[in-house]
């Protein structure tokens, strides 16, 4: 029986090289791979999110924007599952973990990790999650484009990193073996690419039954 495709997620702070590595991996896995970037800004919900991220005058409560981010993931999940069942691999640039970490890092009353994860319960879990970690968040601020969108400040990114680590540690302690933290501090694009491929290649060669999925 033909196995399904693999769902591979690359997570991390802003300007840590996620998108670059997603694009590299996507091209490497052609012709049988699709690339998804969250938020998916081409949808109606994604358009609202894009406006919020790029226009400081567009105000929403922390709870409302968090639920919009989650809704943006839910509106695409059936398409993701369909592609996987057809045997296609999918590389994702951000997903549930980003949504939870960025919202919980705001410190809004009542929005702890458990509350922030609740709207995503039932979404597909990746077969592999790679978190690109850096020891020097300050260096990210010097990269082109940093600060163009809401959340791109060094102070907030430090909070997000701490929240990410708490969230991932919690998932790992619950027995999730699909998460790997990759230290990209002072590493070049090709060096990170090689590290990622060492982790991804064995997952690609593993057979996963057509109807076997994990969920948040």
UniProtKB/Swiss-Prot annotation:
It catalyses: dTMP + ATP = dTDP + ADP. GO terms for biological process: dTDP biosynthetic process; dTTP biosynthetic process; dUDP biosynthetic process. It is an enzyme of class 2 (transferase). ATP binds at residues 12-19. It comes from the Eukaryota. SUPFAM superfamilies: P-loop containing nucleoside triphosphate hydrolases. Keywords: ATP-binding, Kinase, Nucleotide biosynthesis, Nucleotide-binding, Transferase. Pathway: Pyrimidine metabolism; dTTP biosynthesis. GO terms for cellular component: cytoplasm; nucleus. Its EC number is 2.7.4.9. Disulfide bonds: none annotated. Present with 2980 molecules/cell in log phase SD medium. Catalyzes the conversion of dTMP to dTDP. Belongs to the thymidylate kinase family. This is Thymidylate kinase. It comes from Saccharomyces cerevisiae (strain ATCC 204508 / S288c).
């Amino acid at each position: 029986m033909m196995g399904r495709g693999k769902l591979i997620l690359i997570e991390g702070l802003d300007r840590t090289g996620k998108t670059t590595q997603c694009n590299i991996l996507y091209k490497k896995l052609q012709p049988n791979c699709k690339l998804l970037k969250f938020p998916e800004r081409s949808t109606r919900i994604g358009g609202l999110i894009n406006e919020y991220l790029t226009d400081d005058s567009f105000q929403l409560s922390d709870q409302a924007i968090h639920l919009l981010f989650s809704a943006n993931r839910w509106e695409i999940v059936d398409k993701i599952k369909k592609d996987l069942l057809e045997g296609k691999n999918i590389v994702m640039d951000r997903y549930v973990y980003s949504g939870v970490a960025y919202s919980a890092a705001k410190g809004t009353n009542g929005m702890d990790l458990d509350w922030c994860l609740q709207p995503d319960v039932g979404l597909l879990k990746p077969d592999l999650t790679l978190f690109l970690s850096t020891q020097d968040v300050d260096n990210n601020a010097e990269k082109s484009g940093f600060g163009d969108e809401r959340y791109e400040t060094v102070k907030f990114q430090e909070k997000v990193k701490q929240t990410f680590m708490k969230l991932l540690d919690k998932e790992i302690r619950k027995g999730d073996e699909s998460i790997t933290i990759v230290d990209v501090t002072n590493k070049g694009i090709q060096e990170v690419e090689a590290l990622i491929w060492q982790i991804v290649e064995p997952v690609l060669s593993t057979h996963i039954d057509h109807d076997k999925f994990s969920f948040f």
